[in-house]
Amino acid sequence: MKSIQTPSKSHTNTKETPVMSQEETKGYNPREIEESYYKIWETRGYFEVEGNAQIQKPNQNFAVMLPPPNVTGSLHIGHALNHTLIDIMTRYKRMDGYKTLWQPGTDHAGIATQNVVEKRLLSKGIKKEELGREAFLEKVWEWREESGGTILSQMRKLGTSPAWSRTRFTMDEGLKNSVARAFVKLYEEGYIIRGNYMVNWCTHDGALSDIEVEYDANKGKLYHLRYFFKDSSDYIVVATTRPETFFGDTAVMVHPEDERYAHLIGQTLVLPLIGREIQIIADSYVDREFGTGMVKVTPAHDPNDYEVGKRHDLEFITVFDKEGYLNHHAGEFEGLERLEAREAIVAKLQEKGYIEKIEEHENQVGKCYRCGNVVEPYISKQWFVKKEVAQKAIERINSGEAAFYPAQWKNNYNAWMKELRDWCISRQLWWGHQIPVYYCDCGHEWASETTPSHCPKCQGSQFHQDPDVLDTWFSSALWPFSTLGWGNGEAGKGSWWREEDLQEFYPNSLLITGFDILFFWVARMLMMGEHFLDNLPFKDIYLHALVRDEKGQKMSKSKGNVIDPLELIEKYGCDSTRFTLAILCAQGRDVRLSSQQLEISKNFTNKLYNAANFLLLNASSFKTLDEITPQTPLGRYMASRFSLCVEELRGALDGYRFNDGATVLYRFLWGEFCDWGIELSKANKEAINELGAIFREAMKLLHPYMPFISEHLYQKLGGARLEESTSIMILPYPKANWREEKIEMTFEVIMDAIISTRRLKATLELANQKIPVVFIKAPQGMDESLINTFIPRLAKVDSIELLSEKPAACVVDVGEKCEIYLSTAQLDLSPIISRLEKQQEKLQKEVDKLLGMLNNEKFVANAPQNVLEQNRVALKEAQTKLDKVKVELQGIKG
């Protein structure tokens, strides 16, 4: 394919900030390069859908959505991983000729945003209720305009390339319209219903869906209470972890087949302190083997009791209000906060003789995922999406219409969907999408996409809108298609979205997100996309794991191990940070982020920079592989290895094996090109121009992972500057089309012979001396002229002789591809043998000692884990050294 030359005049912006040449600085300065290049890329529109128009292939489209971060948020290390992976795929597809859309945007984050603004107002002594709903919402919008774009600007520092001109917000006008349409359609289809249900209730944030409740282990108490029979001194004992809710008991239940209590069914008990009468009932829900086999029933404050209450038509008594304060049903305790009331209630029960015993007890306590408050089961009138709306999405996932990466997440998805319940979508907040349902004084209820002027039934104007807002995840569930114009009306048409977007970009090609929101977000997008567009929203779903510290611990402020990605970028550069995250990201495994790997990545950028400088010492500029065909043996060899790199890298990226792709790049660029290609060129200067062309082409491969240094070195090696040239990011991605296995085999022997000769000379303490001759036993068919071109120069040998049998009086080094023999006729080997034998003896003792300790069961049982790990590492190192000495001795002794 012809290479793209200089940019069109529209891409030559005289106002672009010049990038300081690296010759004017001390080494590679990523900070300067990154800021300057990013401005040029964004100004030229490269990130947009038509940014690569000149290389786009017909009917090749790629779409990926940014999981919209909270508008309140700032970039954390999980974002950095997620955005890096998305950007790698986006840049790869863009260079490969796809019309590419990476859709950016932010989420209005109902609870989080309202909390932030409420706290700001409270710091000024203002409560939101004093302002009223409309004035408060104005304050939220003001805050959003001031601070809501922070995370998007931080994303730029990571080198990401979304279509910024299309940035959406889940409460922009178009998405408001989309949300209203989705709600009304589901409402009219009977999939959205309203009713009194038991919900998870946070006294601060209101109703929560099941997956918004996080469960923590709690060391509490189990209170055994005496419930006396009516007009009797006899009693039964029931247990509870929440004595403050017993005021809502409306029965005690036993198993209908439990002979111990059959005679008690139907008898009347009297509740302690308040004297209300309840009956003993029979229900098969009771586990006869657990505790006493008698269970108190509190239908308004326990989800299982709620179902029992419905079966037996029990009274549902709510004992505290929405703020968590006990009501009149609690008698003298009315007005106390539910958790603070516990101590007073228990004290009173003890005083009156109603406590049988109190035991220590560990249980799981549900807490609000936002504020950490203890969540209560609470009966409330709420809006729900019926679980049946998800059924077709489940079927289509299991028919293979979308694939999970790693594949095991499909099992997790199915397991969760099997237990799916109706989704509570109403929230008692002011900030968010207000539920588009209206209530008229005439009693009529209806849903409308637009604000109505009158009641459609009585034509009257005395109506009001439901005060609740939708769960934030409702609007996020529409993200893969609402951002493409579905339900937007005319809002944003031609700027945020285009007429053809749904046809070109739905279903999205790929979703990349964390596994932790599989159920919050991914499952809901699947069901909404299937329901409204009759197609799953993604072809592939890649779920990455957590980023942990180098010890494998989850990051938390309390541990002090939180890593700020912006600090990493400042210290190591954007490219090094991205490359580290990618090379550590193996499918299904947590990312263990370490300073050691970051240093390795930083050294990698310096290695590349130094390689380019070496090439430029020999030529002022280099062409590309589109313009020249390698002719020298070294050029052909490196071109063949480059082609293998292309093949393996494409395979890794197409399978979302980001770590494998990074490893392929590292192996080729450092291990093959820098370590060997440049080294071998010292004996073959004619290959320099070809190596320069290959290195430039390799920068295209590197670009999705390390966009800045790849751009810089590509331009620099071409004798150009980005200000006057087309960016590497819209040049065609290389294809694998050049393999020469025979020449690869020859150079493998050459390199192996150089390594073996150097190793043998070092063993014989001749490393810096030039020796007259080395004998090589190699596979047949080797090009003798090539062997004599490279080995003598790089191994410091006068001559090479190929042979088929081992010569007499020689020491040997057996490599992977050949055997090297060096004559010992003129050498006294006894001091070397003596030294190596002493080393062998010392190392053997060390290995035996460590093995003895690690095989000692008592030592292993009592030693700290870090000591055991240190000993295992020491054993591995000692064994490696011992094996090396043995090989050297064997080679010398023949």
From Swiss-Prot:
The residues the record assigns to binding ATP are: K557
Where in this protein does the record put region Disordered?
A: 1-28
Assigned keywords, A-Z: Aminoacyl-tRNA synthetase, ATP-binding, Coiled coil, Cytoplasm, Ligase, Nucleotide-binding, Protein biosynthesis
As for subcellular location, the record says: Cytoplasm
Where does the secretion signal sit in this chain? none
* Composition-biased stretches (Polar residues): 1-22
Q: Which GO terms describe its cellular component?
A: cytosol
According to the UniProt entry, what is the EC number of this protein?
6.1.1.9
Question: One Pfam family from the UniProt entry?
Answer: Val_tRNA-synt_C
| Enzyme class, broadest EC rank | ligase
Which chain positions lie within coiled-coil regions? 832-894
- 'KMSKS' region: where is this motif? 554-558
Give the catalysed reaction(s), semicolon-separated.
tRNA(Val) + L-valine + ATP = L-valyl-tRNA(Val) + AMP + diphosphate
InterPro entries membership: aa-tRNA-synth_I_CS, aa-tRNA-synth_Ia, Anticodon_Ia_Val, M/V/L/I-tRNA-synth_anticd-bd, Rossmann-like_a/b/a_fold, tRNA-bd_arm, tRNAsynth_Ia_anticodon-bd, Val-tRNA_synth_C_sf
Give the motif span ('HIGH' region). 69-79
Gene Ontology molecular functions: aminoacyl-tRNA deacylase activity; ATP binding; valine-tRNA ligase activity
Query: What family does the Swiss-Prot or TrEMBL record give for this protein?
Result: Belongs to the class-I aminoacyl-tRNA synthetase family. ValS type 1 subfamily.
| Domains: entry comment | ValRS has two distinct active sites: one for aminoacylation and one for editing. The misactivated threonine is translocated from the active site to the editing site. The C-terminal coiled-coil domain is crucial for aminoacylation activity.
Description of how the protein assembles with itself and partners = Monomer.
Q: What does this protein do?
A: Catalyzes the attachment of valine to tRNA(Val). As ValRS can inadvertently accommodate and process structurally similar amino acids such as threonine, to avoid such errors, it has a 'posttransfer' editing activity that hydrolyzes mischarged Thr-tRNA(Val) in a tRNA-dependent manner.
What HAMAP family does the database record attribute to this sequence?
Val_tRNA_synth_type1
List the protein's name.
Valine--tRNA ligase
In the UniProt record, the gene name given for this protein reads valS
